Amino acid sequence: MSDETTVGGEAPAEKDDARHAMKMAKKKAAREKIMATKTDEKGLIIVNTGKGKGKSTAGFGMIFRHIAHGMPCAVVQFIKGAMATGERELIEKHFGDVCQFYTLGEGFTWETQDRARDVAMAEKAWEKAKELIRDERNSMVLLDEINIALRYDYIDVAEVVRFLKEEKPHMTHVVLTGRNAKEDLIEVADLVTEMELIKHPFRSGIKAQQGVEF
């Protein structure tokens, strides 16, 4: 029995492979043409926001990339300071020489129920954040859950925006996480990602679990 062939003796699978190769070659050429125009480098202002999971996780992913490359970086946690997390334990135990880690929050606002104390802690965290960002040895600074502090006006968003525009070193990346990012912050950012919530186990009665949420 002979294989099915097209006119000219080319098998259908071979014809599909040739078509695919040509299509991918065109995509590659177009991509390379675009990439050739992208030559600038700068420190990015990155905002991870939205109701979905993964805002802090994405931020820590970039921090771990920095650690892997031996690039000095820092983390300031504005809300989760009272919670023991896997990323905090790992960094403090094994990578403290590359990444500075500061937990200056005392928990979510509904846990503390003390606005004056929350404001004081947020302001303290912001002062530390500014210090770390000004230090040009730090290639990246993650401001974890700062958007929550901004949402409740614990910190003035205008001051944060002004600082990022006027005082952030040119090559320093700053990552700001938390839902409900303020429009003024979104406007000044270079990269904004909104995490969309489609399904969440909490709605099915499943609690936050070690290794997934913390």
Swiss-Prot record:
This protein's record includes keyword Zinc: no
Protein's pathway: Cofactor biosynthesis; adenosylcobalamin biosynthesis; adenosylcobalamin from cob(II)yrinate a,c-diamide: step 2/7
Protein keywords: ATP-binding, Cobalamin biosynthesis, Cytoplasm, Manganese, Nucleotide-binding, Porphyrin biosynthesis, Transferase
Catalytic activity field: 2 cob(II)yrinate a,c diamide + reduced [electron-transfer flavoprotein] + 2 ATP = 2 adenosylcob(III)yrinate a,c-diamide + 2 triphosphate + oxidized [electron-transfer flavoprotein] + 3 H(+); 2 cob(II)alamin + reduced [electron-transfer flavoprotein] + 2 ATP = 2 adenosylcob(III)alamin + 2 triphosphate + oxidized [electron-transfer flavoprotein] + 3 H(+)
Sample GO molecular function, one term: corrinoid adenosyltransferase activity
Enzyme class, broadest EC rank: transferase
Pfam family, one: Co_AT_N
InterPro entries linked to this entry: CblAdoTrfase_CobA, Co_AT_N_dom, P-loop_NTPase
Cofactor(s), by name: Mn(2+)
The keyword tRNA processing is annotated on this UniProt entry: no
Disulfide bonds: none
Localization terms from the record: Cytoplasm
A cellular component term, taken from the record's GO annotations: cytoplasm
Binding residues for ATP: 50-56
Swiss-Prot/TrEMBL GO biological process terms: cobalamin biosynthetic process; porphyrin-containing compound biosynthetic process
UniProt similarity note: Belongs to the Cob(I)alamin adenosyltransferase family.
Physiological role: Required for both de novo synthesis of the corrin ring for the assimilation of exogenous corrinoids. Participates in the adenosylation of a variety of incomplete and complete corrinoids.
Quaternary structure (record): Monomer.
UniProt-recorded name of the protein: Corrinoid adenosyltransferase
Organism field: Sinorhizobium sp
